[in-house]
Each structure stands twice: as C-alpha cells, then as structure tokens.
Regions:
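Family-specific signature for flavin-dependent thymidylate synthase
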Residues: 1-234
Length: 234
C-alpha cells in the first residue's frame, strides 16, 4: 500500500459466499467479493436465468490487477511507482467536488467491487461450460472454479457435473468458436487441456492456467481425459 492506495494481485483476494440454495427450484444465490469492475462487467453480460444485485464499488482506493500487471510491478520499480502515482492522482480527482459529477464518480475497470447473483441451475450450467475454460480471463475463470468448489463443499452434488465445454466436445474450443474472429481467436496459445489446433498465437501462453488458479485460490482444477491419458503415457 502506498498513499492509501491498495493494489491486490489477480484472484488472490477473490471471495465467493453461497448465500442460499433451493434444491426444489434449483436456484442459487451467491456473493462475489474482491474482484475488479471489469470482471463484474463481463459476468453481468449474462442475461438468461440470472439476476445481479447489490453491485457496490469500493469507496476506498482499492484495486485488483491482472497477475501479469502485478508481476511487472514487482519486477519494475519505476513502473510500480508510476502506477501508484497515477492512481493517487485519480483519487484526488474523484475527491475534488469541483471536478463535476461525471469525473468524481469515475471508476477504473480495475477498482475493487462486490455484488450478489441469483441464478437458476440451467443458466449456471451454461456459464460454467464457458467460464471454466482457461481461454477466458483469470478473474471470470477463477470465480467459476471457486464457485464450483464452494458448491461441492456445501454438498450440492450436481456441481460435480460442471466442466469446461472442451471436456464435453473433447477438443480445444479456443480459436474456433463462432463468437471469436480469427484475429481475436489466435491471441493466446491453447492451455493444453486438449490438443490445440491453432497454428499461430500472438502470446505463447494461455490466457489463464490451472496453475494460476491453484496458486492463488488453493483449488486444484480437475484434469481432462486428454491430460490424464498423456500422464499415463509418460
């Protein structure tokens, strides 16, 4: 922390609390904390069978940054200094009543927030299929793996059924989905859960990895049949 500015790493501070579960209606209510505004923005695009409540942006200058940004800050003292100075400058603007209502309420997409979700199991099953895939961003991936584990811990047995879509199709879905353009679909290398068919990737790494999820949340992600077969053959 510097100048009262707090910066948190990736999904280390991510929290998921199951508030209620109704096995008859198959409705779940859960609270998400320690996540950035950009993750809420991505999550709240879901529309069917889901409701978002009590969205609250931190009044304190608390930010959650991508792991790669955090690691860069740790390696580059000058970059870290500039980040804190920029955030402190933004806080001065937010607290200056003479800047006008538009600027005083401005939130960077990395500012910490919390919210509550009410969702039916059909909607959640669809979201899990997409968001458990490591080609998604670390915040949304971490949230859904953590939620899955919390449901299992609460004895909600059907959570064991939740798996990434690529485990259902038994092939890498990245770079070929209809909603991805060819340009966007080759940004990152495949995660290795299934054999990748992409010939080129701008970044020689997956967008998110099971190792990152394990390191920052303590959750061991289940492995695919492909990965287990590879382990047997080694």
């Amino acid at each position: 922390m510097q100048n009262n500015i707090k910066i948190k790493k990736g999904i280390e501070s991510l929290g998921v609390e199951i508030l209620s579960w109704n096995p008859d209606s198959q409705m779940i209510k859960y609270k998400v904390t320690g996540t950035p505004v950009c993750q809420y923005d991505q999550h709240s695009r879901a529309r069917v069978g889901i409701k978002f409540l009590d969205y609250t942006v931190s009044k304190e200058p608390s930010y959650v940054v991508y792991t790669q940004v955090w690691d860069t800050m740790e390696k580059d003292a000058e970059f870290k200094k500039e980040v804190y100075e920029t955030l402190a400058e933004l806080e001065d603007i937010r607290n200056n009543k003479h800047c006008g209502e538009e600027l005083s309420g401005y939130n960077l997409m990395s500012r910490e927030c919390s919210y509550v979700v009410e969702q039916n199991i059909g909607s959640l099953r669809g979201q899990m299929a997409r968001r458990l895939q490591f080609c998604e961003e670390e915040f949304i991936v971490g949230l859904h793996w953590l939620l899955r584990q919390k449901m299992i811990d609460e004895g909600i047995e059907l959570a064991h059924q939740f798996k990434p879509m690529c485990d259902v199709t038994k092939k890498c879905e990245y770079a070929k989905a209809d909603y991805l353009s060819n340009a966007f679909g080759c940004l990152f290398a495949g995660c290795g859960r299934w054999k990748s068919h992409a010939d080129y990737a701008s970044f020689n790494q997956s967008c998110t990895t099971p190792e990152l999820v394990k390191e920052q949340t303590g959750i061991t992600c289940t492995k695919s049949e492909y990965e287990l077969e590879l382990e047997k053959s080694e």
